[in-house]
């Protein structure tokens, strides 16, 4: 009886907390458009769990997912293909009102000052200064390099000096308008969002390399890739993943027109990631950027230097060999002259 009483008096176990990592920016409305209602949906579907939203920068979200500091995360398709190698599971793909196909819903757009006559096409971006989010950003950098790979075999060396702002949207537009850079790279639909909020006058900015209009509602300069993916760590049980996925896929569309749908084809994303050697956990700064950018020029310089050293060595050996022969000839001539002089002296004595 006493044992039974003690078991009854034991406190109820605290609910497990599932940490959800999401990208956060003051101008990125993902949380209000979809994430807040998504968390409420998950709480109602799985009341025994507490869901903690962890807002992070894009790079910090990447690190948190890799280090298993979050249990669930919403990431780009590019980052997901990197994480799935360690067992991450896609639960659902975001469905946005801007695209009829969630498999073609995210890309990049090149912007420049409207009065900059130097830049009228994507090829004009060669050697131009650029502002972008970060070298780890899939939609804000890698997708743009994928478009440039249609022009050159070395897309990473195509642009001029790159200025990474660590924040997308307005900081990039301001850098372009203030002539700190020649052009900027935004993620698709960011430009329209800034214009709609009155933060950017549409007649001050032009889109470079605009793709033809199709089922995608926003301006773009690149191909499109799958939308954001809601994923889970490999450490979560299959039952939890199944319940999470069911709750997401059965959720009605939000008031803003966003929702979740079944997974998209990631083959094009994987191809792009492999082709460009996408390493989202490597933060490139300072010398690393310079070395990566000018590695071919450095290689050519090293080869030229090595060739110069070898040529100098060969010339030195040739000069030394010929000098030795010349000295031998001079010595031989001196010896002959000495012998001739002695002979003349003897002949003079005989006379």
Language-model regions, residue ranges each:
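Acidic, polar ligand-binding/catalytic clefts
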Residues: 63-124, 135, 145
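Short, charged amphipathic alpha-helical "coupling" segments at sensory-output junctions
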Residues: 325-351
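Bilobed "Venus flytrap"/periplasmic-binding protein-like clamshell domains
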Residues: 15, 19-43, 103-174, 189
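N-terminal membrane insertion elements
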Residues: 218-220, 240-334
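Extended ligand-binding regions for polar small-molecule ligands
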Residues: 36-45, 113-116, 202-278
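Pocket-lining segment of extracytoplasmic ligand-binding domains
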Residues: 129-131, 135-236
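Extracytoplasmic small-molecule ligand-binding "clamshell" domains
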Residues: 8-82, 86
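Immediate post-signal peptide segment of exported/extracytoplasmic ligand-binding proteins
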Residues: 1-22, 123-129, 279-290
């Amino acid at each position: 009886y006493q044992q039974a009483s003690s078991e009854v008096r034991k406190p109820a176990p605290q609910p497990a907390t599932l940490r959800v990592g999401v990208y956060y920016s003051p101008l990125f409305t993902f949380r209000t458009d979809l994430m807040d209602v998504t968390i409420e949906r998950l709480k109602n579907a799985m009341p025994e769990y507490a869901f903690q939203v962890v807002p992070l920068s894009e790079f910090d979200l990447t690190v948190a997912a890799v280090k298993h500091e979050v249990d669930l995360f919403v990431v780009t398709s590019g980052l997901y293909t990197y994480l799935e190698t360690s067992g991450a599971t896609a639960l659902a793909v975001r469905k946005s009102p801007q695209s009829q196909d969630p498999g073609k819903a995210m890309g990049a757009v090149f912007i420049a000052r409207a009065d900059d006559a130097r830049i009228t096409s994507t090829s004009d971006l060669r050697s131009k200064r650029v502002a972008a989010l970060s070298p780890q950003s899939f939609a804000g950098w890698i997708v743009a390099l994928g478009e440039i790979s249609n022009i050159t075999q070395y897309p990473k060396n195509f642009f001029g000096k790159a200025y990474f702002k660590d924040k997308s949207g307005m900081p990039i537009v301001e850098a372009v308008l203030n002539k700190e850079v020649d052009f900027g790279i935004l993620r698709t639909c960011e430009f329209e969002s800034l214009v709609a909020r009155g933060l950017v006058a549409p007649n001050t900015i032009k889109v470079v390399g605009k793709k033809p209009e199709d089922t995608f509602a926003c301006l773009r300069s690149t191909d499109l890739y799958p939308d954001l993916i809601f994923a889970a760590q490999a450490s979560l049980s299959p039952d939890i993943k199944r319940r999470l996925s069911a709750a997401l896929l059965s959720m009605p569309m939000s008031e803003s027109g966003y929702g979740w749908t079944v997974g998209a084809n990631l083959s094009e994303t994987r191809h792009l990631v492999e082709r460009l050697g996408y390493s989202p956990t490597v933060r490139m700064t300072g010398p690393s950027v310079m070395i990566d950018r000018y590695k071919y020029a450095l290689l050519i310089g090293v080869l030229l230097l090595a060739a110069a050293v070898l040529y100098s060595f060969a010339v030195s050996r040739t000069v030394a060999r010929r000098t030795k022969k010349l000295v031998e000839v001079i010595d031989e001539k001196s010896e002959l002259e000495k012998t001739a002089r002695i002979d003349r002296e003897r002949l003079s004595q005989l006379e």
